[in-house]
Amino acid sequence: MADDPIAPTPESGPGGATRRRFLQGAGAAAGALMFGGIGGAGRAFAEPASGRGVPTGFRGDMSDLKHVVILMQENRSLDHYFGTLPGVRGFSDKQALRFPDGTSVFQQKDASGAIVTPQVDDGTWGNDHGAWGDVGHRTWDQWVQHNGTSCMNYHSDAYMGFYHSVAAQYTIADQYFCAEFGPTDPNRKYLWSGTANTETGNSDESNYDRPWITVAEQLQNAGIGWRLYSDNSGNGRDGYVSSWIGDYGDNELKYFTGFDPAGLSAGDPKLRPGTGLIWRGNCTYYAGTTAPDDDSDANLDAVLRDFHDACQPGAQYPLPQVSWLVAPYGWSEHPSADSLHGERYVKKVLDILQSNPDIWNHTLFILNYDENDGKFDHVLPPWPEAGTAGEYAGSYPLGLGPRVPMLLVSPWTRGGYVASEVFDHTSTITFLETWAAHLGKPFTCPNISAWRRSISGNLTSALDFGHPRPGPASFPDPLAEQPVSITADHMKVRPLAFHPHATLSEDRRSGKVTASMTLAGGSTGKALSFQVFPDDYQPFTSTPLTVTARTPREYTWDTTATDGKYAFSIYANDGFVRSFAGQLPQAKPADRGIPRAEVELLACEGVRVTLHNDGTRPARYTLTANDYLGGTRQVVVERGQSRTVGWPTQQGYYDLVLTVDADASWTQRYAGRIATVR
């Protein structure tokens, strides 16, 4: 029996519920933004039954996965599509970047200094989407100045009703980034090959001149079945002959030497139906055009005919283990193509998969987007340090680029989850590597940089192979344009086995303040990108630092150059923030309380705060929850003494601000998430 769908409800204003406010059951503003509450009062999904055993026909491990189907659509940011979805780190993110003037990243300034904030607009505008320098990658504050006010627009809950329903029934990744801060072609090369080899611009389709190996070729060599499904209308290398047929030049395999059909005879093994490399890659054109050439359901049937046929029992060429889909322009969501057509295309794909339960119940469908189209997204992407091998084109870091949507539909992602490990386009490749190794057919993509492998996860933290939930699902009609009812506590977070931390130490003799950044837990070589921003006294710019469990990093502020004062913040993904401000005591009278704090993160437990007083008078600390649990507490520490306080978390998340009455300049903030599995 199918689960009840998320029910359509009347539109409830511009925003609906947002981000992690489901943890406290209330909507909150980011910066000056305010959004509405939960939209509508229709039925919502029930929680999955606890203690459910492994269903018949499943082993409860990765061997249950038989098919991976990957669809990369075009040019949308995560905030643009999902900034209002409950449980997703969107417009009410209280851990978002703040600027020195007190405004937040949601309050972008135009050339005149006027503030522009996100606004609902269901149009199909496009924005410029060039390389890193375009939005101020070291400050994240030039979106409007480069891309215009429309880059701040986002789609309404009603317009996104279908996609919001898919996310609420399955899993959305809210720390998924495009591979490069650039346009379509480089990002698609990362999906199919693990690199763009420092390319930062689009190029002509089907020139077949990239010499490096693709993942498709590696699958072929490993004996893993694969195929790319697209409409191949056209006579030559034009990419597409209309909006509704062809591949829009998005079949990136046509850019690689291994798929060049030139000079091959009709009997060449590369062209052999069913097994040939070029046949599987759909890298030759046929004369004529697909009919009908319009946006009808009949056209959808036509452009997806090969995929449909592969999913039928007894198919001549059955669905292989790995499939890629490439949509014609009009269905691709690339502005000015609209999102509703893309939602119709995706629903058709899901309907085709569901038509064969043997396939549906053993398939992972991955929907992602190649790039953000210049559309605003507020979350800082991980950033490589200068000189990082394979991650710079001249002086510009290649990636990661802004967040883009990723939805994961499968029996192992069902139930309404948010996965918050850092992923990018190469994560799909490393997932395929992991699966192939499990199948006994290992391969390793040689093109993914070591830095990227350490930063971006392999998607496995988003899936629960031990508790599959097979069976059909119901999805709303995209053309209904109805918002869906998602209760504030519906979305759940996927657990992580690692957490970042940063602590502060003051050397009062030298005048230096040092932040020490660490990473605890995770797989061997796991890394996280920290970015340090001065909040005052120094120019506002980012210092990136890559941290692993074996390579902690430090950031030092010399207060002798700033009159003994310091103020800076450290940001990392999934809501990690540290903010430290104060003035070293030698610049002030000594007859007072002198604050010092030590904060420990206890995996699967909580936060432990030890408050010290290095001065000569009592110090009264105030501990305030800026988000999540904790409320407000006051703790008095006598001179030369210390006191320890336990601080709670919600699903591992915490956000705590420390102040002290003895020193108005002193404040510390600790926000993030502790590991919730060992």
Question: Which residues are covered by each model-predicted region?
Answer:
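N-terminal pro-sequences and low-complexity stem/linker regions of secreted or lumenal proteins
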Residues: A2-R678
